[in-house]
């Protein structure tokens, strides 16, 4: 990985992209320390110190790079964009017009879907900004005095500041995707989690020595396991029939169709977490973080939450896999190019076989993601001190996954540059 970064730095084009990505992330981090007006940051910090470790807000805070607990302009982070992406992608399957736009619209259709996602992000940012303001207002009425000035105008300024921040995060992510390295939103999320590590270390050192050893060994084992699964793939053998065109013979070679075990990446975990944490987030925003339903169903440390979380991960893994792999299209492409899978006729039998393989991989990949994501919940229920750690299986999956994807993107661009040099 370090060697890849070193080699990429020597290439002027990639060096510019790396510097641009770092520049955008720097802008994001600067925005993460600019507080919105009419909020007492000191009182807010005292309040969050008492609730972050015991509610879902601690996870939100880690995902936002601690901007959430400081009520900064970028406090909402990437959450509105992620929720908007979930809504639009589900509607794309449910509404035929959107499905046609996504599949048959080409580049224009893709741009229209992106534009709809942007508008939805702003709408959700406005809604979540209002919810965050109401949470601060509710706790201000309980004696915390977080909001320094009451009234319609201060409320409007606070909500619009949060909304503008969510739109800015979306725009920064798009700039990284277009002009930088890797997926912009993933890079921002990666930077947020990395920036939360010092605070996690501070919490870690408060544990008993044997708990520290277990946590460190667990994280290392988790990283190695994630790296192994990310590189694992099922290869379906493909043969091409020989074709004679004039005096030349084409085809006849053997190749394979690689299907990655972790084909859907980290998105099922991120989406499942957004959906499952919604009730607990509403409870946290309204201040109702107690009671039977919250403790036994909505709380992220409950077993019911763990089961629902696992089911949602399985659903989104299947959902993303169906979007990524159109087995009928793959079968038709093989048939038109003279390719076939040994033992299966071209057409429907080939499509059915590929779908059968993908279904098996989806089950394994979903179980893998579910186990990794649920390990922190299980560890937190077995060891009380570990529950206060903001880092979890989701965070480790995101950090490792984004790092591997970034390295692969750099390697692909370096390889492309070598091909360009050869052709030139």
Question: Which role fits each region the language model picked out?
Answer:
Residues 1-424:
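N-terminal cationic and glycine-rich segments that engage phosphates or anionic surfaces
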